[in-house]
Amino acid sequence: MMKHHYLFLKLAMLALAMQLTANTEVQAQDVQVQTMHEELENGITQTLWIENGARRIFGELFTPQQPRKESSIAIIAHGFNGTHEYGRHYHETLGRLGYSCYALDFPCGSVRSRSDSNTLNMSIIDEVSDLKAVVRHFRSQGFRHVVVIGESQGGLVSALTAADLKQDVSQLVLVYPALCIPDNWRKHYPRLEDIRDVTELWGVKMGRRFFEEIHDMKPLDIIGQYRGPVLIVQGDKDQVVSMDDSRRAQQLYAPGTRLHVIPGAAHGFRPDELKQEMEQLETFLKKE
């Protein structure tokens, strides 16, 4: 029990460190769009709020100076206790390829979320709903090619989202996806009655609902419903996410799914390892 608790603690810690750098009617907020940073060489960044029913989702939209002929966007889903800032790693590569990029803050997904920082209401189910809302929003705005990129817990959310939105997600990228989260917590809390009202991980307080909703969830029985192109990137020294899960996911997805293993990389990439990820991403996107 403690072993699995420790693994998830590591997931929380590493995701936090890396972040330094339903069918719902979806509509755009009467959005206040403003430049957040200095104009980049290959594009600009702006704030964009998207609504999912009563939920308001904050995000940062990067628009390249030279967009692709076919309107294309990558949507970035951060990991546990992360934020939209994770998406900035992708601006250079995506801008060079002519892709827009939208990185969101999952409501209740982080103590630093600009959408909603009340992590007691964190929920995988809600994050899937929010990501689906974002995908549908950009589809409604005329983007014909939508790529979803998810890291760690965001990888789990992205995989579940793509399984539901088979026709709307053009390509899927999973970066050390934490498909193990339900199984880890099921072992820590074998019975529903074992779940505490509040579970705290590295200062992040999570409510019962998070654990109740995933108690019987089996992602590997679901994610293969998505049959589009998939890229999985993971390090062979990852002590949080089992390489076996990623290998099995590769087999569950359509033929041609690529699992790129970065030698020596753990759960969270150093700059040289991040460069490898971007090289793989560029090759993957150029195929379509």
Task: Annotate each language-model stretch with its function.
Residues G228, S242-Q251:
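Short alpha-helix in the alpha/beta-hydrolase fold that links the catalytic acid
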Residues A265-K275:
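Catalytic histidine-centered segment of alpha/beta-hydrolase-like enzymes
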Residues L94-R114:
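Conserved alpha/beta-hydrolase
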Residues D30-Q66:
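N-terminal cap/lid segment of alpha/beta-hydrolase-fold proteins
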Residues F80-E92:
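The serine-hydrolase catalytic nucleophile loop
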Residues S110-F143:
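Catalytic nucleophile-loop/oxyanion-hole region of alpha/beta-hydrolase
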Residues L165-G207:
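Hydrolase active-site cap/lid region
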